[in-house]
Amino acid sequence: MRVQKPKGTVDILPDQSSSWQKVEETARNFFNRANYREIRTPSFENYEIFSRSSGDSSEIVEKQMYDFNDKGGRHIALRPEGTAGVVRAYVEDKMYAPEVVKPFNVFYMESTFRYERPQAGRQREFHQIGVESFGSSNPLADVQTIMMGHDLLAELGVKNYQLHINTLGNEQVRKDYHDALVNYFTPVKDELSEDSQRRLRDNPLRILDSKDERDKKFLPDAPKIREFLDDDTKNNFESILKMLDQLGIDYVIDDDLVRGLDYYTGVIFEFMVEDKSLWESATTILGGGRYDHLVEEFNGPATPAVGFGIGEERLMLVLEKQNPALFESNSIDFFIANIGEGTAQKAIEITRSLRKQGFEADFDVNQKKLKAQFKKADRDHAKYVITLGEKELENGVLNIKRLSDGKTIDLSLEDINDMSKVMGELKD
């Protein structure tokens, strides 16, 4: 048997997971400060949840979704993105009920799955951090969502990101734009890729998202959606841009931005990072927008909504270069080195007491020689080593050594139970 992880998956080992934890803890604290609460949904759903939300003609449904029939004959899919499952939960668990405060604001951190070619920052199992806000059609909801994405990236230490923004208008705007795209692409249909020939029939907007060179040559002269905006949609978009200006959030109006999912309506946006050492062109690390009809699509009441998702793998690649402090090795506060008859029991008691007080503490369960224990303390990046031998146990006095400069102090065994008394002296 070949023991090997599946293609497109990675092991996040202990020396790497600490940086992931820091990013997720920063994001979790950020969302809580914004009055968003965590939601957790299943990693698999009924297939229709994703096919209806993403769109049958989307690349996700056509090529990337992991789906299968389970032992009960149910058509199941692993989630390819986070929004659909949250919307399903919103409807099924009746979060639209009047007694639930609106807007209903949630965030999530979860694994997602897409069958695509693995490359830098893109795996077949990847991690997504996202937010969703249900219940407000006010442009302030769009602005807050964009502002949160902008400020979270800044708080994480991303430096050279740029906001790209566009609007997909209302239903009439999208219908008029749909017809214009059909009229534009139909004369060159035979020159399009096979996928885009099908998209021309099902959803010509998807052609604008094509990466195929046969399609890309026609995109610069394709109609732009803002040519079809009515006054209401135009005013909505301009009010959002004005608020972003007042917040000092720079942006680029990107006519080619359409996002890869069919459920988007109104304003859509992406935060992009350009780093030639990672990717040939600017790459999206956060994307989102408004989706005002998806709750209805899932048989819920008409509910406006807006949100975004972050690809955590891509984010970590950027942060590794731009915020290396996140990737520094973790340290522990205390390592208890013990040697001699009868010291092991006291060592574990001291470790337990320190942990209860909120300190990070460890000891050597293998009872190696003292020199080896000090080496382990150094590898664990311990700040202090407490030495416990037969003499210390007999006298009830411990020696604490600060590894950064070798400073030592003595304290009684009783002091261990309230280290707040001695931490000031240890830090001097």
Swiss-Prot record:
- Compartments where found: Cytoplasm
Which Gene Ontology terms of cellular component type are present?
A: cytoplasm
Q: What is this protein called in UniProt?
A: Histidine--tRNA ligase
Q: What is its main location?
A: cytoplasm
One Pfam match, given by its short name, reads tRNA-synt_His
The residue ranges crossing the membrane are none
* The organism's place on the tree of life at top rank: Bacteria
Q: Which UniProt keywords apply?
A: Aminoacyl-tRNA synthetase, ATP-binding, Cytoplasm, Ligase, Nucleotide-binding, Protein biosynthesis
PROSITE patterns from the UniProt entry: AA_TRNA_LIGASE_II
Key word Amino-acid biosynthesis present in the record?
no
Q: Under the GO molecular function aspect, what terms does this record hold? A: ATP binding; catalytic activity, acting on a protein; histidine-tRNA ligase activity; transferase activity
User: Which reactions appear under catalytic activity for this entry?
Assistant: tRNA(His) + L-histidine + ATP = L-histidyl-tRNA(His) + AMP + diphosphate + H(+)
For the keyword Nucleotide-binding, the answer is yes
Q: Name one GO biological process term.
A: histidyl-tRNA aminoacylation
UniProt gene name = hisS
Q: What class of enzyme is it?
A: ligase
Which species expresses this protein natively?
Lactobacillus acidophilus (strain ATCC 700396 / NCK56 / N2 / NCFM)
Q: What is its EC number?
A: 6.1.1.21
Quaternary structure and interacting proteins, as annotated: Homodimer.
